[in-house]
């Protein structure tokens, strides 16, 4: 297989025509292929701070120090009552920045994972192979950084809450980093959707960043 420069995440600065001998390419490729991100989402979009400038500044500060954020086992909840204003895009941007900072010497180790929570919960109920299910839960309990996208969008069943609580509680107790996105804008609203224990673990252990701007997808 010929690996071309246009397939590289660093094509704007890389001078190699082919990637076959590039360690960075293969290590980044492994991180991406085991990140849960679709091909489209592996290339971050530019996010303009025309609204929510303070929130964008705080997130950019976290982005610039993302390795310490992860190493310190910190958590972040990006939320808004509106859709399409950059919550998920920012979460992915932070994940990709982490990959960019730790690829050197990483080898072939899985370090970060993106989960769209509604899809994950549906899959968790329908795993035909219990071994595969246990492997997934083990990975989520041990990996350095997990993005829990759309974690607080609808009221969850007791079963769904328990599935999330088992993993998230373990991660927080073990000092592993989490980034959550959702549309619940208060602790009480989160309790109503996720139950008291899970809501408190997320809300009380996270840096809270609220987006107040409305849908901005047309700008991007």
Model region roles, listed by residue range:
Residues 1-64, 207-213, 217-220:
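A short, basic N-terminal segment
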Residues 64-67, 124-146, 162, 166-170:
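Conserved alpha-helical scaffold flanking the Walker A/P-loop in AAA+ ATPase domains
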Residues 69-70, 105-107, 138-141, 169-174, ...:
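Conserved catalytic network of the ASCE P-loop NTPase/AAA+ motor domain
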Residues 71-92:
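Walker A/P-loop nucleotide-binding motif
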Residues 95-112:
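Post-Walker A helix-loop "phosphate-sensing" segment adjacent to the P-loop in P-loop NTPases
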Residues 109, 114-124:
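A short hydrophobic beta-strand->loop->alpha-helix junction that borders the nucleotide-binding pocket
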Residues 111, 142-145, 174-180:
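Loop/turn-to-beta-strand initiation segments
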